[in-house]
From Swiss-Prot:
Gene3D superfamilies: RTP801-like. Its main location: cytoplasm. The keyword Nucleotide-binding does not apply. One of its GO terms (molecular function) is 14-3-3 protein binding. Regulates cell growth, proliferation and survival via inhibition of the activity of the mammalian target of rapamycin complex 1 (mTORC1). Inhibition of mTORC1 is mediated by a pathway that involves ddit4/redd1, akt1, the tsc1-tsc2 complex and the GTPase rheb. Plays an important role in responses to cellular energy levels and cellular stress, including responses to hypoxia and DNA damage, via its effect on mTORC1 activity. Plays a role in neuronal differentiation, neuron migration during embryonic brain development and in neuronal cell death. Keywords: Apoptosis, Cytoplasm, Mitochondrion. One of its GO terms (biological process) is response to hypoxia. This is DNA damage-inducible transcript 4 protein. The gene is ddit4.
Amino acid sequence: MPARWDAFSALSVPPPILEEESPSQFWGEDCANVAQRCSSLPSSDCESLTSSNSYSECDLDAWDEISIPDSELLNDPEGEQLCPSLLKLINRCLTKARINSLRCSRLLIPDELLCNLGQELLHLAYSEPCGLRGALIDLCVENGKDCHSVAQITVDQAVVPTFQLTVLLRLDSRLWPRIQGLFSTKPVPGSGQSLKLSPGFKVLKKKLYSSEELIIEEC
């Protein structure tokens, strides 16, 4: 009888449980290699605007398809559908912008700028509660240390903005002799002409529902 009990006990012992390795061992190395692109600024150099251009109130025409490369980060279908119309509005605001109260110079926007800006807007909006619809966008043009406000866009008036994006655009550096008289206070003969924007730009992101530091992305 004891022999049978010992045999039964030996059969009933469960196999040992093997502990799995911590998942952090698999992605820890990847996280360590990710470069931090965030920094903080005490305040923005851009002046506040007295008026705003709303996406929902503008009469937008059919916008030609803009090719935006696929990315794992662009996982917001609603934002991807909204982005082409938003870029159309941004293009319209920039071409109609009054750079100076004395004269109006038309800004030329390269296609590469709009394409890159579309990618960046989706990238910065993908983790937000309302996605791109919750964005408040300030368009500015940099001139040396000065920052000139162009327009402010509320993407969706029906949504309370959850984050603010300040887009800092730059004029083409090859046009510097023509740029010098653009922002002057005195009229310069022949200066009211078209100027081309550079494909490069900088975006400052500020979350409106938290006290986190500003995030700066430069393209």
